[in-house]
């Protein structure tokens, strides 16, 4: 079963991170070690997170230290569409695709010059700003995206707890991300691309 989430659906969703967006899809669960910025695990069909493969523009994306992808490193403003394939694909991708595959396609350049931006704010001091531009001329195209996220955090302990001392543990979160995609269309269906992501 394949689910495709296009750009218009991404913009209409309430989720502000990739994990929150995926969690709204049937057959996908996630759990996190805390609030914003903490390691989150995405699970498909009830299997461990290490059995869900994440591809960004066809390239495997993972963490050598965590053993699973860092799902929230990619800002949603950089995403053009998401394809979710549920079920075992280990014959094609290996054991990390037993649960399924999440394939993300980032935004390409657009004819002429297109600029976009977004600002949002929420509870617990959450605020986010994103901007980007897309350009294409002849065989060349480029897309650049910038995003800044800030969150004051919240306390996971309960001030009204019956036992023990209350010790607030507000864990704030700051994230800056930049993504770049350059493309050159060659003869026929041949294309050369360079991708960069820093978060």
Regions found by a protein language model. Give the residues of each.
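Short, charged/polar, Gly/Pro-enriched secondary-structure boundary elements
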Residues: 49-52, 108-115
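N-terminal periplasmic "start-of-domain" segments of outer-membrane beta-barrel proteins
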Residues: 1-13, 41, 49
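Non-catalytic regulatory/gating segments with a bias toward low-complexity or hydrophobic composition
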Residues: 22, 82-84, 102-104
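Periplasmic-side early beta-strands and strand-to-turn transitions of outer-membrane beta-barrels
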Residues: 90, 103, 111-112, 120, ...
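Extracytoplasmic/secreted envelope proteins and their assembly/folding machinery
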Residues: 2, 7, 15-22, 71, ...
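Residues that define the transmembrane beta-barrel architecture of outer-membrane proteins
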Residues: 96-98, 125-129, 174-178
